[in-house]
Amino acid sequence: MIAEVRGNGTLAWRGRRLRCALGRGGITTMKQEGDGATPAGILPLRRLLYRADRIAPPTGALPREPIGTGDGWCDDPAHADYNHQVTLPHPARHEELSRTDHLYDLVAVLGWNDDPVMRGRGSAIFLHVARDDYAPTEGCVALALPDLLMLLTEGMTALHARTD
């Protein structure tokens, strides 16, 4: 089942409207690495990553795995591991998944630029926990943790990020 995301910062799901944060560059059909935009299109949820030291394993049908201190995500378009989860330390530019804030306490890896990976088309596009003020992301979609858990429990399988 697909939730609809709009550029005004709302996510529609089963007759409800939820507040969400989007990339600081809005929603774009021309996603590029570093543009800060959320990619337009249907983004399937591939798997869940979670901080087992902070939350219980999420329920639902998606594969899930805990985030460890050695987990990262390569965002260096020049490296062979671009847009893949990596083990830290890693020689290329990367994000650490084990963050000190709570944004990555629960992460749904979205199917963007992963089949196949195309260098420079964007990496680390996730559905994750929003900041308290719903500040813009670097291109991800972010929700309050209770809303994110509800969507997963109710069987959401994809996001449709729309530019209209």
What does each model-identified segment do?
Residues 143:
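A conserved hydrophobic position in a structured secondary element of the catalytic/binding core
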Residues 140:
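Short cysteine clusters
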Residues 1-137, 147-164:
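Cell wall/extracellular polymer interaction/catalysis modules
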